[in-house]
Amino acid sequence: MPSLRDIRNRIGSVRSTRQITKAMKMVSAAKLRRAQDAVLKTRPYAVLLDQTLSRLAARAAAEEQVAHPLLAPRAQRTAEVVVVTSDRGLAGGFNSNICRFVQRFLTENADRFERIALSTVGKKGREYFKARRLDIRKDYTGVHANLAYEKAEALAREATERYLAGEVDAVFLAYNEFKSAISQKQVVVQLLPIDTSAAGADATGIDFKYEPSREALLAELLPRHVAMQVWRALLESAASEHGARMSAMESATKNAEEMIASLSLQYNRARQAYVTKELMEIVGGAEALK
């Protein structure tokens, strides 16, 4: 049976842990509000840009007048999956959920591609797939620190360069899509080549006017579209991470409080037993002196 000192030390240790988890919860809550605002502001622009470019590209493809390399289909033998995770842990199942989701994607598409490589954004993704000896083409760390659109542009540019150089025939983007503070959805979307199939039927009935030209518009907007999809994924992942960490720290704080209550009860019972024992010894000694 643990001594009173051991129980008291344990209570002090758990209280210190509770202070840490409570502080982390408050910090994550503040970061979540900012990240959520950024996601909600970016989503409409990203969706509208995607729809507009998809219609424009589908119309161009239907008229067979423009063949942009980011739109042109090709035999898909090799693929790359860019997996967005975090640099830090203590976020519940945030990282493990997306990593397992990507593993299922790799298994399901093993027959579709001769080779699938990975690029990881965040230390946790790199550690997860490296431990399983999977092919990691490139890893990016520190992206989430001072998250900026320029970082998304750099990621998109490197992925586009590998695609245009023929190193890969398709690029996919995997990340946690933000739903709420307690809910995230794991998604894998095709980044390259840009898929216009969903807008094909609607686009053929639209009469577009191009200034200065269709080729110039596609050359300018398609790379921007790729960068915007990466930027949206980074923002969605950041909001999901803060929400997951806030929930995990809230749960940890509640568990710590329950443990403190249990240990305090154990301490009081042990102290009561100790006092009772002392009283019995005093009474026994007094009886012996009679």
UniProtKB/Swiss-Prot annotation:
InterPro entries: ATP_synth_F1_ATPase_gsu, ATP_synth_F1_gsu, ATP_synth_F1_gsu_CS
GO MF annotations, alphabetized: ATP binding; proton-transporting ATP synthase activity, rotational mechanism
Major site of localization recorded for this protein: membrane
Subcellular location field: Cell inner membrane
Gene3D superfamilies, sorted: 3.40.1380.10, ATP synthase, gamma subunit, helix hairpin domain (1.10.287.80)
Keywords for the protein's UniProt record, in alphabetical order: ATP synthesis, Cell inner membrane, Cell membrane, CF(1), Hydrogen ion transport, Ion transport, Membrane, Transport
Protein name: ATP synthase gamma chain
Species the sequence originates in: Anaeromyxobacter dehalogenans (strain 2CP-1 / ATCC BAA-258)
Gene: atpG
